[in-house]
Amino acid sequence: MRRWPVLLAALVMLAIGSAALSRPHQPVDGADPSTSLNARTPVPAPVMSSLRQACFDCHSDETRWPWYAALPVASHLIEGDVTAGRGQLNLSRWTQYNPFDRADLLDKICERASTGKMPPWQYRMLHSEARLSAPDIRALCDWSEREAARLVQGGS
């Protein structure tokens, strides 16, 4: 019977200790603006706005960390999601992809936005501004299809 209070106290101390060790997220060092999506790729303002609202937090080096990202468990979950997102697509390093990879990524952006896979439902639940409307998705797909075609035809 006396084990439960001791176990609970140990868990509380562990939580407090891990909170103290949790570091605030810092901007990415060495981020080069000349490699970002809009550095050499013409992106209409409404499309860029949609990308910033729905994609950039996980798919760029310009992550806006929410307040709850400083909480111990949430910090690790969110950091894992952002790391995975940047690994799949990093809009801050857009020019580092070859033109065919960029065209493929543009196709995936349209497909995932159209099917509701991106942004993920848990992100949309916490970030209402990330919910893309049907016209937003159509504009995003129209642009991505045009840009992908341009890249495949020899654009850079």
Annotate each PLM feature:
Residues 19-32:
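Aromatic-capped interface at the extracytoplasmic side
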